[in-house]
Every structure is written in C-alpha cells, then in structure tokens.
A protein has these predicted regions:
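Boundary/entry segment of secreted carbohydrate-active catalytic domains
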Residues: 2-27, 159
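Short, well-ordered coil/turn segments that N-cap beta-strands
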Residues: 12-14, 37-39, 66-68, 122-123, ...
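Phosphate/diphosphate-binding glycine-rich loops and adjacent basic-rich segments that engage nucleotide
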Residues: 169-197, 202
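Short, acidic/polar
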Residues: 21-34, 105-116, 199-206
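Enzymes and membrane/adaptor proteins characterized by extended Gly/Ser/Thr/Asp/Glu-rich
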Residues: 37-152, 180-191, 219-227
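Conserved, mostly hydrophobic/aromatic
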Residues: 41, 73, 117, 159, ...
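Acidic (Asp/Glu)-rich catalytic clusters
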Residues: 30-36, 58-65, 165, 209-211
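Acidic, His- and aromatic-enriched active-site or binding-groove loops in soluble protein domains
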Residues: 99, 141-165, 190-207
Length: 227
C-alpha cells in the first residue's frame, strides 16, 4: 500500500528505472509500469528475440505508460544489446582510428544506432562513454572515445551530433570517470586512489560538454580522496 510516508520518500528519491524479464510484459510488470514513480525502462539482450518483437514490446510499454522512457546500453562494439536486424556498429576505439575521417565516422555511428533504435521504439541509449582510456580498465577499454580528455571531448561531440540528428537524447557516462579503476563494477567495487586534482581532469570533460549533455550516468566507483 502506498502510504503518505512512502509517497513522500518516493518523491524525495525520485523516479526509478525498472527492467523487464522477457520479450513480453507480465501482469506484474504492467502494474509496476503504471506506478507513478516508475520513470523509465531499461532493456537488455534477454528482451530481444527479433526486431519485430522488440517493436511490439516497446509499443506495449508505451501503451501502458505513454511518454515513459525506454532505454538501453547500445554503444556499438561489444556493448550492443540488439544484433539481428541491426547494424553492427564498430567499437568507439575502432571508430576513432580513422584519421581525418574520425569525426565523420563517429557522427555516422551515432546516427545509425540512434535511428535504428528509434525505429524500434527505443527512446534513448546510454552513450557516449566519457571515460579516458588509461589502459587500465578492461571493462572500459575499447568503449572509450580517447586516451586523453581533449580527444574524448572532441569525439564525444561528434558522436552526439549523430544521435541528435536521429532525434535521440544522449547520456554521458560514467561520471566522474571509470577509466582509472580496474575492477568491473558489475561484479566488484572498483576503487580509484588518485588525487582530487587528477580526478578533476576526468571530470573536466563533463564541464566541457555541459551545454550538450542531456543526462549523465554515475560510476559505481569508490573515489578514495572523496569517499
């Protein structure tokens, strides 16, 4: 039962992002989508059987809650949840090795992945990755847009231009930076033992893109100088 106390707590915490178990909605999931504090849905590989079924699932979600955000981690390379019927977008590391064609390639990658997702009913992908590739983090690795802050910022701007052209919002991640932490935060608690000044170098990417970023995803990392 949603008591006044629970409702007050929910409003303090804000809307939550929920997941779906399979390729069709269950009655329980429909009730959860109807809850006023459900703000978005995140899809995974388990929610994908075909492009047609994905469109049907997204349509069903939007029918229950018109305007709810349907999201996915679909960056290209090894982080691409949907394969069959979708373009195999190269990793960001592959895209950024095209010399003077790098910006055009990244813009094209952003447009292709965003336009295909939009056609399926997905509203947003969690991209770009704004973590600097220090050569330490395997979970970031070739997902990174550069090995220094200027390269990351420049390449992210190109990728976001493609997303924008297809009508998709962006999400910079993993704030304030996951490139130095070695552990995979999906299975462990990574730590970053750098100084505050060094971490602020990573964070400056977000400052440089502040007028263009529409959302951010935080890192699940313990920053020893702060935490």
């Amino acid at each position: 039962m949603l008591t006044p106390k629970k409702l007050a707590l929910a409003h303090t915490l804000g809307p939550v992002v929920v997941d779906i178990a399979g390729t069709v909605l269950t009655e329980h999931e429909i009730r959860r989508l109807e809850h006023p504090m459900t703000g978005a849905v995140i899809l995974f590989t388990r929610n994908f059987a075909s492009a047609e079924m994905l469109r049907a699932l997204c349509g069903a979600i939007h029918a229950v809650r018109p305007g709810i955000l349907i999201t996915v981690d679909h960056e290209g390379g090894r982080v691409q949840r949907f394969r069959e019927g979708f373009t195999e977008v190269p990793s960001m590391a592959a895209c950024r090795t095209a010399g003077d064609q790098t910006q055009a390639r990244l813009a094209a990658a952003g447009y292709v992945l965003a336009s295909e997702l939009r056609a399926a009913g997905v509203d947003m992908t969690f991209a770009p990755v704004l973590d600097i590739d220090y050569g330490r983090s395997a979970v970031i690795g070739n997902r990174s847009l550069g090995s220094d802050r200027d390269e990351v910022e420049r390449n992210a701007r190109a990728l976001m231009s493609g997303l924008r052209l297809a009508g998709m919002a962006n999400c910079g991640k993993h704030f304030p930076g996951h490139g130095w932490a070695e552990a995979d935060s999906h299975v462990a608690c990574p730590t970053d033992n750098r100084s505050a000044a060094e971490i602020r170098r990573d964070l400056s990417i977000y400052r440089g893109l502040a007028l263009e970023l529409e959302s951010i995803m935080t890192a699940h990392v313990a920053y020893q100088c702060f935490d």
